[in-house]
Design a protein with these regions (language model features):
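Long C-terminal interaction/binding lobes of large macromolecular proteins
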Residues: 1-239
Length: 239
């Protein structure tokens, strides 16, 4: 006689970008094992494959394509799936800012971690009086690379590559140039032709992009100094 099947609980959350309700379930043991083994390998390709596989399996709402979600939606979703799977309280060790060496243990409730939206954030960038650029958020692959890439590389080249993948289109009143129709070399040359002011506007897009963020207060047990620490991005909470 076959063994009975264990009922898996389901949960709902709202995607920060659209407010759309998404049903999901926790990791199963086999999926958690897959993630742990991938993280222990410190191999970015293995981690990418594992996170993609787990997110696709755990998201139950039809029509949700994980690969197309904004980075901050992916972070928020992954954090909550992990919370329902291994515990909704995260235990971290924070280095006190005042002496930069003393570690303090803290506990954070997953529900207290929000995606912060900056009012100055914009996906539209004015390059000159006639030309505009529209940016898009990093892909799932870029998200994983930024959070879990253990390989040292040329930071400048990586930055240019990231920016290039986030340019959706360049347009004016008469024409639209979609970067999907361009080569990486053409996009890179276009970026290199910008002046400093234009490039700073692109940097501002990334600096103000919605992100997981949580502010905590820590007191250094040695100096008794209380400091505020801002934790940003999934990697800060992935301990």
């Amino acid at each position: 006689m076959p063994l009975p099947k264990i009922a898996t609980p389901t949960y709902e959350l709202e995607l920060p970008s659209t407010g759309q309700s998404v049903k999901y379930r926790p990791f199963l043991v086999k999926e958690e094992k897959l993630l742990v083994l991938a993280l222990e390998s410190e191999d970015t390709k293995q981690i990418t494959t594992a996170i993609k596989s787990v997110l696709k399996s755990c998201v139950l709402t039809k029509g949700i394509k994980v690969e197309t979600l904004p980075t901050f939606d992916i972070e928020f979703l992954f954090l909550h799936i992990r919370g329902k799977s291994v515990g909704e309280e995260l235990e971290l060790r924070i280095i006190c800012p005042d002496d930069k060496e003393t570690e303090v243990p803290i506990t954070i409730d997953v529900d207290d971690i929000k995606v912060q939206i900056n009012d100055e954030h914009s996906k539209q960038i004015k390059l000159d009086d006639n030309l505009m650029m529209e940016l898009k958020y990093p892909s799932l692959d870029e998200f994983i690379k930024n959070n879990f890439d253990f390989n040292d590389g040329n930071q400048m080249e990586q930055s240019f590559e990231l920016i290039g993948t986030c340019i959706d289109k360049i347009y004016n009143e008469e024409e639209v140039w979609a970067t999907a129709d361009c080569t990486k070399k053409e996009v890179k040359e276009f970026l290199e032709s910008m002046n400093s002011s234009q490039f700073k506007d692109i940097e501002k897009f990334f600096e103000t992009m919605p992100k997981l963020s949580h502010t905590i207060k820590v007191t250094n047990p040695k100096t008794k100094v209380e400091s505020e620490v801002v934790l940003e991005g999934l990697a800060s909470f992935f301990a």
